[in-house]
Amino acid sequence: MADFFTEKPVATNVAEFSVSEIANALKRVVEDKFGYVRIRGEISGYRGAHASGHAYFALKDDKARLEAVIWLSVMKKLSFPPEEGMEVIAVGKLTTYPGSSKYQIVIEALEPTGVGALMTLLENRKKKLAEEGLFDAANKKPLPYMPKIIGVVTSPTGAVIRDIIHRIFDRFPLHILVWPVRVQGETCGREVASAVEGFNALFLGGGIPKPDLIIVARGGGSLEDLWGFNDEAVVRAVYASAIPVISAVGHETDWTLIDYAADWRAPTPTGAAERAVPVKLDIEVHLASINSRFRVGLARYFDFHQQKLRALVRGLPTVDQLFALPRRGFDEISSRLQRALCVSYDKKCFYFHALSLRFSPRLLNTKKAQYAIQEYTGRLHRAFLRNVEKQRAQVEMACRLLKSTSYQNILERGFVLALGKDHKPIKRLMQLPETGQISLRFFDGEIDVSTHDRAVNRSLKNKRIKSQKDDQGLLF
């Protein structure tokens, strides 16, 4: 027994690994060999997202089962919620989990497959959005009759955009803005929603003009091809658009959720172009017809009223008829007035003749004398007034002369008048009393002053007078 435990191991060339080494080696082999793969399968064991936001489930078919995980960042980007039993195509990277010796796929994109699964998902989404009122007819906006600018959301390289441009230019040429998007694939829904929101974000007067109408168009295809136009983000963007939207996705039998949210659904992209703009020639013909009818109607209107006016004119009396009665009355009144004046004149003449017979020649002479006296009286009164005015003028002239020679004017120029006790002017120095009172009259008043030492003052004054005698005379 002891020999058994002490026996040396048999020599071999097989490499020896630890559990973790072999697990990591398998992990590298799987990841390097396969990398990214697309796997079709049925979702199994899905119970919704974990508390962390990640989702753990399995993909299976009738023979095998593969564990799968979707991280939170990818879950937020999915265009539909995964459901138990849904057939999908998962795109991701194969890897292993060394802790439990399991291999799994880390899903980075997930899309439904199979018509049944897609139809179920479509119906559920349609019901949900309809309950929110996104498809209500009351929310539909009227389309402009003649838009100036049309925004088109579609692929820039497909036949759809060429058909739309060709049809619009045939009917009514105008400005077209194309917002290029992918019309199929995983990013289709997000790009279409961003395009609709982008057109609404433009403002009037900017570098890029804001369209008056938006057309979202795509050619026909399968349910999977058109799935991007069933995206919830597309429906909400179209519903929130302030610009009217025409949906033209697929053929007439193809219905997507954008058709329910749009303001008008066209069976084809060509039909959308025809609905967007009227035919210019039809408008011109219609305007010409309206113009012609207007001219005819206007001519009829004038003819009718001209005939009516002529009838009214014929019913009106002429000028002679209008003035015949007043003229006749005027003539009668003129004749009566002339006769009345003649009669009155004759009466006055007869009356004055009768009065003249009543006056004697003496009375007539007295009347003539009275008239003469009245005339002479008037002439005398007028002569008296003229004489009074003449005398008044002479008095006023004398007053002005007297005022000009008044000594008050001299006092006003700065001179002083000396008055003695008798209030007579003192003209010479010798007239001053030796002692006593004299009055000095100024322009604005009078003051009494006393005199003394007349001899001294007189001699001084005499010298001054002699020196100035030749230059200035006496004041008075």
UniProtKB/Swiss-Prot annotation:
Which UniProt keywords are listed? Answer: Cytoplasm, Exonuclease, Hydrolase, Nuclease
Q: What is its EC number?
A: 3.1.11.6
| Recorded catalytic activity of this chain's protein | Exonucleolytic cleavage in either 5'- to 3'- or 3'- to 5'-direction to yield nucleoside 5'-phosphates
**Biological-process GO terms, alphabetical:** DNA catabolic process
Any single Gene Ontology cellular-component annotation: exodeoxyribonuclease VII complex
The subcellular location is:
Cytoplasm
**Where mainly located?**
cytoplasm
- Coiled-coil regions listed in the entry: none
Pfam families according to UniProt: Exonuc_VII_L (PF02601), tRNA_anti_2 (PF13742)
| Gene Ontology molecular function, alphabetical | exodeoxyribonuclease VII activity; nucleic acid binding
Please give the function described in this protein's UniProt entry: Bidirectionally degrades single-stranded DNA into large acid-insoluble oligonucleotides, which are then degraded further into small acid-soluble oligonucleotides.
Q: How does it assemble?
A: Heterooligomer composed of large and small subunits.
User: Which family does the UniProt entry place this protein in?
Assistant: Belongs to the XseA family.
**Name this polypeptide is given:** Exodeoxyribonuclease 7 large subunit
Tell me which species this is from. Answer: Bartonella bacilliformis (strain ATCC 35685 / KC583 / Herrer 020/F12,63)
